[in-house]
Each structure stands twice: as C-alpha cells, then as structure tokens.
A protein has these predicted regions:
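Catalytic-core regions built around general acid/base machinery
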Residues: 50-64, 115-123, 177, 225-229
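Alpha-helix N-cap and loop-to-helix initiation/capping positions
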Residues: 46-54, 81-88, 108-115, 139-142, ...
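Short coil/turn segments at secondary-structure junctions
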Residues: 42, 104, 134, 207-210, ...
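Glycine-rich, proline-tolerant flexible connector loops at the mouths of alpha/beta enzymes
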Residues: 33-57
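Hydrophobic residues within beta-strands of alpha/beta enzymes
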Residues: 32-33, 70, 101-103, 131, ...
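Active-site acidic/histidine proton-transfer and metal-coordination neighborhood
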Residues: 19, 61-68, 76-161, 170, ...
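Active-site beta-loop-alpha junctions enriched in small/polar residues
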Residues: 8-12, 35-39, 74-77, 105-108, ...
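Histidine-acidic metal/acid-base catalytic patches
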Residues: 1-6, 13-31, 63-65, 92-97, ...
Length: 272
C-alpha cells in the first residue's frame, strides 16, 4: 500500500471543503481534512453539520475528484465537556466517509480528560471513526507523554495519538519516546517544517503554528527521524499554513509545492 498524502484544513482554511477538494486534487494529493468546528473562539470553520447545501456540494466534489476525507476537526475537551452537542458533528463526519476525528485537550485534570476521551471514542465507534488526541505545547495536554497517558487510560480500541511534527519539536519531545508508543495508537500524522528553535513567547508559538509554517524540507525539524519512527503506511496530513506565502503564490501553487515537498522528504523513509 502506498502512503497517502492529504491536505490538512489549516493549510488552506479559507477554502470551503468543495474548493479544497478540487484544489488538492489538482495538486496531486489523495484527500483532505475538514475543519467543522474552530480551533479557537471566532476561528474559521466550515460547519457542514449545519449546512445541508454545503454538505451536498462537498460530497459531490468528493465523488467527482475521487478524493478521500482523512479527518474532521475538532473536538475540544474542557473541564465541563458535554458530548451531546457533538452528535451532529459525528454523524456528518461519518456521512463524509472520514476516518479520524481530531481531539484537543483544555482540561488540566488528566483523569477527567481520559474519561471524556473514552466517551468520545465510544460515540465514534459505531461510525467506524477513530478519535485522535493531538498534543499541543500551549494546551493542557502539551506533549507526547501526556497524550500517551490519556489515551492509554481511556483504553479504547479506536483511540489514538496524532503527532504533529511542529508540536513534537516545540514541546521538546524526543524521538526515542515514540518507540514506546504502540503502533495501533498512531493512525496518521501531520507534516510541516519550521526553524529548529521556536518563538520565545506563547503568542509567537501559537501564531507560528496556526499562521506561518514551512514546507517540509526547508526548515530545521528532523522530519526523516520522526517519520522513520511512525508506522510506514500511516497517512500524512500536510499542515503548512502561511499567511505570507500562500496568498502570493495562490492556493493551487502553494498546495502543489506542499504535496511535492512532503513526498520528496519522505521518499525512502521506511517507518516502522
């Protein structure tokens, strides 16, 4: 099986899903992700669960392009997490034929987070969807070790960890930490690049992650070392937002370069 490369929604968040499917297909990608709920209050999201016309158009574009929907973003688990408002989100993810739902954590209580994550997994299981916990250095679940504890404690067959190359580096994670993560936890991973040293402030860290990432191979991250420790056939989500470069090049060219760079960097990387 050939490794698949999909465009993450953050790479071209302004494009509604039908247009992103078409642009990603022209760029040589295998699929896309869809952000149906925002990463932060007021952020961009394409709420297909509330827009039947946009959902129909997205499904039509998916069929016309032959592309897949890799993942749906995002569920945020806070101290007062309530699963019920997400039911329509989950149903729409299944209707799109997605494989994974991205989860982030804002609750400092790990036991409570693990219990909530288990409920998310249980709700997704009938749809054949996995729940994948993405650690981010500015959230309550800031690194690989914390995500591993939560996913292990939840003990759900469809629970996993999403490794983002930038977050892995900025959280100070070490490559050897991946050796103890069960391969079954690692359903897919996100690729990008950036300077070896990250911004000094929290605000700078968040801005770089959300608005200004580099194409794979043009920064200082050890991408070959990282992906050599991830499952060889795990799909790749290309997450390369750039508020400065993408508008100059145009979406088609930016996505084309992102796909080509990702394939080039991972060519010959065996994985495990």
């Amino acid at each position: 099986m050939t490794r698949q490369f999909c465009i993450g929604p953050l790479t071209a968040l302004a494009l509604p899903p039908p247009r992103l499917l078409e642009a990603a297909a022209r760029a040589g990608a295998d699929g896309i992700g869809v952000r149906m709920l925002p990463a932060a209050p007021g952020g961009i999201a394409h709420r297909l669960m509330d827009d039947a016309a946009l959902l129909r158009e997205t499904l039509a574009a998916k069929a016309a392009t032959g592309m897949r929907i890799l993942d749906i973003e995002m569920v945020r688990i806070g101290p007062a997490f309530d699963l019920e408002p997400y039911r329509g989100f989950f149903e729409t993810a299944a209707a799109l034929g997605a494989a994974h739902v991205l989860v982030a954590g804002d609750d400092p209580d790990e036991a409570r987070t693990a219990a909530a994550f288990a409920r998310v997994c249980e709700a997704l299981r009938p749809y054949g969807l996995s729940a994948d916990f993405e650690f981010m250095p500015w959230t309550a679940v800031r690194d690989l070790a914390a995500a591993k504890r939560i996913v292990a404690a939840a003990a759900q067959v469809n629970g996993g960890i999403l490794v983002d190359a930038l977050h892995f580096a900025r959280a100070g994670c070490q490559l050897h930490e991946l050796d103890d993560v069960p391969p079954g936890f690692l359903h897919y991973a996100q690729i990008c690049d950036g300077p070896l040293r990250g911004p000094a402030t929290l605000e700078g860290l968040i801005h770089a992650a959300r608005c200004e990432r580099g194409l794979p191979g043009e920064g200082g991250l050890d991408l070959k070392g990282l992906f050599d420790r991830l499952p060889a056939q795990a799909p790749i989500c290309i997450e390369t937002p750039s508020d400065t470069r993408a508008p100059v090049l145009g979406w088609d060219e930016w996505l084309r370069q992102a796909v080509a760079a990702s394939r080039r960097v991972l060519r010959g990387v065996a994985g495990r």
